[in-house]
Amino acid sequence: MSAAGKIMAGRERVRVAVVQTPPVFLDLERSIDKACRKIAEAAAGGASLVVFSETWLAGYPYWDEGWNSDSHAWMDVRNRFFDNALLIPSAQSQRLCEAAAQSGVTVVIGCNELDARPGVHTLYNTMLTIGDDGRIVGKHRKLRPTFVESAFWGQGAGDDLYVHETAVGRVGGLICGEHVMTLARARMISQGEDFHIALYPGAFNVWSGPKMQVEDPDGSHFIGYASCRAHANEAGAFVVCAVGLIDEASIPADFPMRESLNISYARGGSMVIAPAGVPLVGPVYGDTIVYADCPARMIKLSKAIIDTNGHYGRPDVLSLRYHPEDRA
């Protein structure tokens, strides 16, 4: 059997790293500088898979753009947002590829992606995956921007829901609210993930308790954790949950919508979850790199009990259609 056909590409253990640090907000070039440094730092820490949070390049739109927004501030911010989006491929994305190759690591990073086809300048919320050889393995555009996100990003076409063979095994992923799109998760699970990457902009405050009346100030009841733990159990895979971090010091003093920012939930909270759905590391808060050692034996033991694509599946009763392949 080739390494490509083995769990975690035949490795007994993979160290993953979540880079939980603020980008240089709405500054693509300097954020790429920082990303390259952090990739090297994580690799020096023994990581083979390095993950950054949702739209880490070069910042999630944490500000409010209601109808009462100042039009001049809105135009200024939108120009910054547009001008600091990433083209794929480009000289900027090539720098990330070179950093991955130089450190010999697989990199997954969230970005604001600019679609620069002639006459098309839509932005997308994109997950970019780069192999340890510096090759772009794949990119996935978020299928459906959530709530007010629709004002910033277009809908992904959906033709990129694939799990990729990498040096650390089969890597798939989804972005934030896609984890409540049950069929999207089923699509990833059906392809056999070793690692599932889950990107979020922050650990949202929710209310807990039997009557949802207890405030959750530290985000420990963040609904993303429930989705990620369920996915780990169902997929028999490690889930790397990368949660965004930013603070007031990271926002430029001249940012026009500084007063309308909602960044209280962008405090980190990244975690790595074992195949049985139990947290392996985290949640961890603050500016740091979160490391976790992931042994292949955990996947093997999980699948010995529940193998969703094997003995625990009933394709004769239930099946999933992926429409882009129907149209191919």
Regions found by a protein language model. Name each.
Residues 13-25, 126, 139, 169-178, ...:
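Active-site-proximal beta-strand elements of phosphoester/diester hydrolases
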